[in-house]
Amino acid sequence: MNNKLTALIFLGLLAIASCKWLNEKSIQNKIDEKIGKNFLGGMAKAVVHKLAKNEFMCVANIDMTKSCDTHCQKASGEKGYCHGTKCKCGVPLSY
């Protein structure tokens, strides 16, 4: 039960962070409070950091909000492709 509550809190913090209500540092401080400075806490903080760096909302090669494609159309006129969590203009996935 405690693991489910921790996961729910973590997902809630990620949702709030994506709305720009909180910044990465405050979420990582909450993780330290709730989970602690252990292996699981470090993993959770790494996920938060990776998602916070994600400027164009690319998740697992999927352009969730079409912001990658929109950015590339404005910048270079090419189609935008998500490579993991990175947006690349005019470079389709090769696998």
UniProtKB/Swiss-Prot annotation:
Signal peptide (residue range): 1-19
Cystine residue pairs: C58-C82, C68-C87, C72-C89
Record domain BetaSPN-type CS-alpha/beta: where: 55-95
Tissues of expression: Expressed by the venom gland.
GO biological process, one term: defense response to fungus
UniProt keyword annotations, A-Z: Antibiotic, Antimicrobial, Disulfide bond, Fungicide, Secreted, Signal, Toxin
Main location (coarse class): secreted
Top-level taxon of origin: Eukaryota
Cellular localization per UniProt: Secreted
Cellular component terms per the entry's GO annotation: extracellular region
Record GO terms (molecular function): toxin activity
PROSITE patterns, alphabetized: BSPN_CSAB
Family indicated by similarity: Belongs to the long chain scorpion toxin family. Class 3 subfamily.
Function description: Has antimicrobial activity against yeasts and bacteria.
UniProt name for this protein: Opiscorpine-4
Species the sequence originates in: Opistophthalmus carinatus (African yellow leg scorpion)
Taxonomic lineage from the root: Eukaryota, Metazoa, Ecdysozoa, Arthropoda, Chelicerata
